Amino acid sequence: MKKTDMILSPSSRWWAAILLAASASFIAYAQSKLPTDLYPQSRARLPYLKKSDMDAKGQKIFDTLPGAGKDDILRGPLAFSAYNPAVAQALHDLHDAAVPGGTLDPHTRELAILVACRETNYNLEWNAHEAIGLKAGIDARLIDVVRYNRPLAGLNEKDATVIRFGRELFHDRKVDSATFAKAVELWEKRGTMDMVAVMSTYAVSGYFAIAVDEHSPEGKPELPALK
């Protein structure tokens, strides 16, 4: 490809600027329509917790949790489960056992996380793990299959199995015998249960986000409604 092929014409640059501005305006408009029962800082029905909100035992747990800032405010995926600090600690331990402590390769693990976030409309972790998934080698077109709940035709066997497994687990609430058998064939018994654990840990945080109607941070996109 010639260098000149990469240069946009003035007209193309103008249209690109218009589309970018329109996209930004749409996000700003959507976020201006937030429900009235949300706290501005957390963009959820509950405020972020401060360390001073907790008793002595809770404060010790607070110091161990990811998302605890220098301002002593807890943000991130454990922000709302930490209303019971022991639950937040348990979820953190589950994450560490399932994700870094599991046997799944990064590609499979990140795809499983994206499926769990998609099935629970979990914007916070979706936005973080979409970028991580791309770095792990997940193609952007595959991510869009998950994002838009598209058919699995044309996907390779492993990717299709991860997505099908997650959709059956969360949407159908019943994993088909053939789907389970294929997962065991691909990742063995331990790997299949590791996949369930990975999906579960992100889904649980997603359920907390659903309960408090957590919205994406300002300027960040939100997942489209599942069809």
Model-found features: residue ranges?
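Bacterial N-terminal signal peptides
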Residues: W15-S25
